[in-house]
């Protein structure tokens, strides 16, 4: 069977999926991941029917970094029979101002993408590592980069620029938006399950390991809460939209070096910094610590605030969509956010919400509230197949 491999690499985990190809149709064959890299490494994979294919732990020294994790995943994948690899699709967080759609990767493109590492220091180096390795090991297999920023590149210029001298915009200092692969999938999925709403004004809340929100009009991104780097918006693993005066205070008054400020913002901020406990929403909801309650209240407030901002950018709202880990699986968070958006006409059906229904608003709600699982990997696979199937590929 002809197959595609989809790779999503992070600092402490490596996710991969194998899709079978029949014509232009894709069928998911395998889901896998290596997590706990450098601490408690574990390789797991399941078949499409849920059958466990491997569950193996490693010594921390054996899988101490991402390249080692890639090597172990590749070693296992090579034991599989019946697949003919046609291409590899990669999630790349930052495409900068130049990449507005997926692209076949060559050495020039790879060098160009490496130049965006300062724009996404936690993500870009990890995204590019498996690409480099794949190009070395399988130079004849096409590698495709799919960007989290690309879906937002159609924003009007006045929404993406900062009030700085124009030269900074020309250098790439602008609002980009992220989680674009997720939003693109939701836009397509919404056309299937709620076609009327999909043509209107939709606010999507991607509440996963990172969090952001996006305003869609007729399936196109109009505005996003994430800005220049993937550390802004209603996030919980970083401080979100931080007043630049705070950064100046840390440098000028506290005497912190730039790297120390970066470490603070990327590693010690967000809900973990505010609560002193965890970035995991499940831990915070289960805790009776008042700081945990404060962190949850802060997060919900930021989501409600951003929901109102996006509704204003869209000129109103017809539907609201929850997606990603917390958005799909946390009824308490969904309930509190919808309650905060009641002034926009959103009315929650508590029973549907607790049951995890696809539609959790009442029949009389002016805003339809949906819960839709996202599928960034399928979006990457679709883009990859389309690109390698193009006449000039």
Swiss-Prot record:
Catalyses which reaction(s): acetate + ATP = acetyl phosphate + ADP
- Taking the record's annotation, the residue ranges forming a coiled coil are none
Does the keyword field hold Iron? no
Where on this chain does substrate bind? Answer: 91
> Which GO biological process annotations does it have?
acetate metabolic process; acetyl-CoA biosynthetic process
The protein's organism comes out as Rhizobium meliloti
**What's the cofactor?**
Mg(2+); Mn(2+)
Functional note: Catalyzes the formation of acetyl phosphate from acetate and ATP. Can also catalyze the reverse reaction.
The protein here is known as: Acetate kinase
Give the HAMAP family listed for this entry.
Acetate_kinase
Q: Which InterPro entries match?
A: Ac/propionate_kinase, Aliphatic_acid_kin_short-chain, Aliphatic_acid_kinase_CS, ATPase_NBD
Looking up Pfam families in the UniProt record yields: Acetate_kinase
Family statement: Belongs to the acetokinase family.
Q: Please list the residues that make up the active site.
A: 148 (proton donor/acceptor)
Quote the pathway field: Metabolic intermediate biosynthesis; acetyl-CoA biosynthesis; acetyl-CoA from acetate: step 1/2
* Protein keywords: ATP-binding, Cytoplasm, Kinase, Magnesium, Metal-binding, Nucleotide-binding, Transferase
Location of this chain's protein in the cell: Cytoplasm
Name the encoding gene, please. Answer: ackA
Positions marked as site (Transition state stabilizer): 179
**UniProt: ATP binding residues:** 15, 206-210, 280-282, 325-329
Entry EC number(s): 2.7.2.1
Binding residues for Mg(2+), per the UniProt record?
8, 376
Q: Can you name one GO molecular function term for this protein?
A: acetate kinase activity
- Summary of subunit composition and partner proteins: Homodimer.
* Cofactor note (record): Mg(2+). Can also accept Mn(2+).
What's one GO-annotated cellular component?
Answer: cytosol
